Amino acid sequence: SGSMALNRMQAAKGAAFSLLTEAYQSRDQISLIPFQGDAADVLVPPTRSIALTKKRLETMACGGGSPLAHALSMAARTGMNAQKSGDVGKVVVVCIGDGRANVPLDVSLGTAEPLEPGTKPDRQALKDELIDTAKQLGSIPGFSLLMLDTENKFVSTGLAKDIADAAQGRYFKLPKTNEAAIAELTQGAVGAMKA
């Protein structure tokens, strides 16, 4: 997510590295779809190459916009294509972010102009779009969503939980503790979803 602070980005990357270890041990395919700026991008298409994914993850930047609806849409498309190829049966989409989107889907898709600098999108419209996208993802056969919430505020917006609920997925708050706790949480959560 582009809206994560640097310290939470390190925690998110720690969670992602734990997931890479789990994927390697399970011989799972993985894909990396960062969402920042105006659009999400498939940085690493489905692969078993942990080394490539780790290298791309290490150099991944954060900041700028958070086109979360586009990221979920890209994850759905990438996962469905992998299913159609016959290489993948079950798809677990792991979304690491705070749930706060600030880029409308039509801007990400290029069907609308980016917002003028200083202009903010309608928050309720963004939330509705995000919830609808999560519901669509959750309705795809063989798909499940794991939402790892990086929000680091005293008063939480609860958006990440709403996304997980809309997709009928699982939700976990990313711990503020150490990498071992993050690794334990992420590996346990993914293991439970694959069972």
Language-model segments: residues:
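Von Willebrand factor type A / integrin I
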Residues: 77-90, 103, 107-195
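A glycine-rich helix N-cap at a beta->alpha junction
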Residues: 61-64
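Von Willebrand factor
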Residues: 1-46, 70-74, 78, 89-96, ...
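Short beta-strand-loop
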Residues: 5, 29-59, 79-84, 105-109, ...
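Solvent-exposed alpha-helical segments within well-ordered globular domains of core cellular machineries
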Residues: 10, 14-21, 51-58, 69-77, ...
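Active-site metal-binding loops of divalent metal-dependent hydrolases
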Residues: 99
